C-alpha cells in the first residue's frame, strides 16, 4: 500500500483504531503525522491521541502485531485518566514535577498499586507515541516509580474454595454461566480468554482447548477436565462460532459477580477462578511445575503463591500443638 502524500486531508480529523488505523499513521508523511499529533496534544483531542497511541503500540511495542487484546483495551482508560488530570497541563511541555504529582494524587485517592501501574503504563505509551510522531521530546514518566504494595501477593486476591465453586455451579441455571465458571475454575482461563474461546479451538477427542487470546500474545493448549467436557457437550452452538455469548471481559466479570450474589458467595472477581484452578491443582498434585504448566506461568515464583494459599498442612500441624 503506498504512502499517503504530504498535505493529504483524507485522514483528518480522525484516523480510527485497529490495524487499519495503525497502518494509516505509519503510511502518513512524517510532517503530517507530526502536525496532527501536535494539534491533538494541544487540543487534548482524546480520539486522535488514543488512535496515535494504539498505532505506536501495534507498530513499535515489544509485542508488535501480537500485542495482547487486553493491553489495547486497557490503555485508553489510562490515557483518558491522564488527560482529565492534566486538563491545565501542556501535554507537549509538561511541568517537570507533573508526573510525580499525578502519581501522588492517585495514591491519595487510595488506588491500588496495580491500578496506578496500569495508568502509568498508558501514560508512557502516550508519550512514546508523541515522541515517535516528533510532536514532543519530553518523557515525563521516565523516572516515575510506582509505590510498592507491602501486601503479600497471596493476600490480595484469594481463590474461591471448593465449596464456593460448588455453590456457584449449583446456582448457574444458564449453561453458558456454568461453562464460564468451569473454564476459570478448572481450565484456569482468564476472563479475556474465556470470551474469545471459539469452537474451532475445542478438541473433544484430545480433551483440550487451544487458547489464542492469551496474555502476552502466546498461544497455549489447556487440558479439559471431565466437568468442562460434559458442560461443553451440552452447550448450544452459537452462529458466530464463539463458545460464550459474552463479548467483553467486563461482561464475564459481571456474570460471575451476579452468580456470587445468587449463591451467597463473597465476590472475589473473575480472576480468582483462575487462582482456584491453581490452588486445587497444586493441592492435589503437590507439583509446582505441573501447576505452572497448566496455567502457563513463565516463572515458578508466580506459581508459589498457590502453595501459600494451600495451607492445609500448616493448619494441621498447628492444630496438634
Per-range role (PLM):
Residues 54-70, 76-155, 235:
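N-terminal core-binding DNA-recognition domain of tyrosine recombinases/integrases
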Residues 136-138, 150-167, 216-226, 238-243:
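DNA breakage-rejoining catalytic core of tyrosine-based enzymes
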Residues 148, 152-153, 162-191, 195:
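Basic, Lys/Arg- and aromatic-enriched nucleic-acid-binding interface segment
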Residues 182, 186, 276-298, 305, ...:
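C-terminal catalytic core of tyrosine-transesterase DNA break-rejoin enzymes
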Residues 187, 196-231, 301:
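Conserved tyrosine-mediated DNA breakage-rejoining catalytic core shared by Y-recombinases
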Residues 213-216, 295-320:
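Catalytic-site neighborhood detector that most strongly recognizes the C-terminal catalytic loop/helix
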Residues 225-266:
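Active-site/catalytic core of tyrosine-dependent DNA strand-transfer enzymes
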Residues 249, 266-285:
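Short basic/aromatic active-site micro-motif
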Amino acid at each position: 500500500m503506498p504512502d499517503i502524500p504530504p498535505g493529504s486531508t483524507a485522514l483528518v480529523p480522525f484516523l480510527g483504531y485497529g490495524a487499519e488505523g495503525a497502518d494509516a499513521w505509519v503510511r502518513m508523511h512524517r510532517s503530517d503525522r507530526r502536525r496532527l499529533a501536535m494539534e491533538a496534544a494541544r487540543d487534548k483531542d482524546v480520539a486522535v491521541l488514543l488512535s496515535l497511541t494504539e498505532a505506536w503500540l501495534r507498530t513499535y511495542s515489544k509485542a508488535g502485531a501480537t500485542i495482547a487484546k487486553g493491553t489495547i483495551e486497557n490503555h485508553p482508560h489510562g490515557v483518558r485518566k491522564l488527560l482529565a488530570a492534566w486538563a491545565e497541563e501542556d501535554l507537549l511541555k509538561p511541568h517537570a514535577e507533573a508526573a510525580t504529582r499525578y502519581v501522588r494524587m492517585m495514591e491519595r485517592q487510595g488506588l491500588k498499586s496495580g491500578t496506578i501501574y496500569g495508568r502509568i503504563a498508558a501514560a508512557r505509551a502516550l508519550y512514546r507515541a508523541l515522541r515517535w510522531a516528533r510532536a514532543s521530546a519530553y518523557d515525563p514518566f521516565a523516572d516515575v516509580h510506582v509505590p510498592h504494595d507491602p501486601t503479600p501477593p497471596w493476600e490480595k486476591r484469594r481463590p474461591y474454595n471448593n465449596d464456593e465453586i460448588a455453590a456457584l455451579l449449583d446456582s448457574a441455571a444458564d449453561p453458558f454461566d456454568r461453562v464460564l465458571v468451569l473454564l476459570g475454575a478448572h481450565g484456569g482461563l482468564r476472563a479475556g480468554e474465556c470470551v474469545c474461546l471459539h469452537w474451532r479451538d475445542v478438541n473433544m477427542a484430545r480433551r483440550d482447548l487451544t487458547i489464542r487470546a492469551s496474555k502476552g500474545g502466546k498461544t497455549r493448549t489447556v487440558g479439559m477436565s471431565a466437568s468442562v467436557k460434559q458442560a461443553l457437550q451440552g452447550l448450544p452452538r452459537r452462529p458466530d462460532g464463539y463458545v460464550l455469548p459474552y463479548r467483553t471481559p467486563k461482561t464475564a466479570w459481571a456474570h460471575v459477580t451476579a452468580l456470587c450474589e445468587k449463591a451467597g458467595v463473597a465476590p472475589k472477581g473473575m480472576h480468582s477462578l483462575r487462582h482456584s484452578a491453581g490452588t486445587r491443582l497444586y493441592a492435589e498434585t503437590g507439583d509446582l511445575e505441573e501447576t505452572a504448566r497448566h496455567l502457563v506461568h513463565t516463572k515458578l515464583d508466580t506459581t508459589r503463591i498457590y502453595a501459600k494459599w494451600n495451607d492445609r498442612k500448616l493448619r494441621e500441624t498447628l492444630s496438634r500443638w
